[in-house]
A protein has these predicted regions:
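Short, conserved beta-strand element in jelly-roll/cupin
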Residues: 98, 131-149, 193-194, 201, ...
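Short acidic/polar capping segments at secondary-structure boundaries
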Residues: 110-117, 128, 135-136, 144-149, ...
Length: 256
């Protein structure tokens, strides 16, 4: 179901909108169970990356590895459960409203915060990872668990997407980057507690942050970033890891 006029205006003004109960329980359960299978190594991830919490001991969670994230568009190529999710009409209808009828997937990831050891994600803009024009792609954040301030819910800086792309710097582990040009703190942000099946639609230039997970429960979410099929790389030599996947509508020669 598309956004209401009020929700659409909020997205344009604030750079985000949360749609409650966007996905049904069966969909949430299927995605959660599939992610858990990869966490337990019951399924092999051959077309996407698996990253662990940098400071957690391997045995911190017993039979489950302290996985921080699975990353790569290969997630939807390799696994039908993830492919069905990124094509779910409840999500795609909203993205069409924001981006138009021709859509490619730019990113897919499972963002996890394991109990007690889930680390923070510093303030950043998703657009900083991707040399894409126009710089307006939509990040979709699907809550698979109850997401709270205690376990690391999304926190955003409303309206800051209008400031454009800010300078970023690399952080000390994996592929993370953090905003260096502005000094945001959690006091600048609005926390977005969410229930399983709620979906956050977020402008790629919106600064956001998640705190560590200090609870005894997992905080799991699935991310899908959608761009217009006419999008182009702004760099002649884009990063090798940048990928795309046709979601709906037409594709265009010379575009991403």
């Amino acid at each position: 179901m598309p956004l209401t006029d009020e929700q659409f205006e909020q997205y344009q003004r604030d750079g985000y909108v949360v749609v409650e109960d966007c996905l049904d329980g069966a969909t949430v359960e299927a995605v959660t169970e599939r992610i858990d299978a990869y966490v337990r190594n019951d399924r092999d991830a051959t077309q996407f990356e698996r990253m662990l919490e940098p400071d957690a001991e391997d045995a911190a969670l017993g039979d489950a590895d302290p996985v921080r994230k699975f990353e790569g568009v290969g997630m939807v190529r390799e696994d039908d459960v993830f492919a069905e999710l990124v094509r779910d009409e409840a999500i795609v209808d909203v993205v069409r409203q924001l981006q138009g009828p021709n859509l490619h997937l730019l990113r897919s990831a499972a963002m996890l915060k394991p109990p007690r050891v889930g680390s923070e994600k510093k303030f950043h803009q998703d657009a900083a990872y991707y040399p894409i024009h126009p710089m307006d792609h939509v990040t979709v954040w699907v809550a698979l668990d109850q997401s709270t301030t205690e376990n690391g819910c999304m926190q955003v800086v409303p309206g800051a997407h209008t400031d454009g792309l800010l300078g970023h710097e690399a952080v000390e582990y994996d592929t993370d980057i953090a905003i260096s040009e502005a000094d945001y703190t959690p006091e600048d942000a609005v926390a977005l507690p969410m229930e399983p099946g709620d979906v956050l639609f977020q402008h790629c230039l919106l600064p956001h942050y998640t705190a560590p997970n200090e609870t005894e429960d997992w905080r799991r979410a699935f991310i899908a970033a959608y761009m217009r099929s006419r999008s182009r790389f702004t760099d002649q030599n884009p990063p090798e890891w940048v990928d795309s996947y046709d979601v709906t509508g037409d594709s265009f020669r010379g575009c991403v």
